[in-house]
């Protein structure tokens, strides 16, 4: 028969709870909706870029500068002039039309409302997100600040822009 050995060590809690609490002031950016980088056009509002270089420049700015800035400064609620809820009806409705094309299953009916936020800094690039509790869900990139009328940002002829990274990527995957 073997001899019983007593365990003299006290167990430590090694399991961490990574669940996000609604009471937590920290913001979380969830990339759950994969079409947020997809390009689409509705009337004068487009998420197409001129070319691959413009798209890459913008996505690097978003991931490397904008999102870290939002994480760091969100507790200030209304971080800056370019990070805020979208409350103007005409701007909201422009974005909703584009969101319905990019994410057709997101809004189950026309009465369902999203709380939309614009994230941006001093450049023309804006990320349009839905906010639920303390989670932001990017839904589209407004590369050209077309949701809001602006003399300084809206002067480019974006109707000719047709670069879509997902279309190019998917085409390359087929080869």
UniProtKB/Swiss-Prot annotation:
Full protein name: Uncharacterized protein UU032
Biased composition (Polar residues): 1-10
Annotated source species: Ureaplasma parvum serovar 3 (strain ATCC 700970)
Region Disordered, annotated ranges: 1-21
């Amino acid at each position: 028969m073997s001899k019983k050995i007593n365990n003299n060590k006290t167990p430590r809690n090694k399991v961490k709870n990574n669940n996000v609490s609604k009471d937590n002031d920290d913001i979380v950016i969830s990339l759950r909706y994969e079409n947020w980088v997809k390009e689409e056009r509705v009337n004068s509002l487009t998420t197409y870029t001129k070319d691959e270089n413009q798209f890459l420049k913008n996505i690097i700015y978003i991931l490397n500068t904008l999102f870290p800035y939002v994480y760091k400064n969100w507790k200030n609620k209304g971080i800056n002039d370019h990070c805020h809820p979208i409350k103007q009806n005409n701007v909201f409705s422009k974005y909703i039309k584009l969101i319905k094309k990019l994410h057709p299953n997101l809004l189950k009916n026309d009465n369902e409302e999203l709380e939309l936020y614009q994230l941006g800094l001093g450049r023309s690039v804006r990320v349009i997100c839905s906010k639920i509790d303390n989670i932001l869900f990017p839904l589209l990139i407004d590369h050209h600040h077309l949701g809001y009328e602006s003399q300084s940002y809206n002067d480019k002829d974006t109707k000719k822009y047709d670069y879509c990274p997902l279309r190019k990527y998917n085409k390359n995957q087929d080869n």
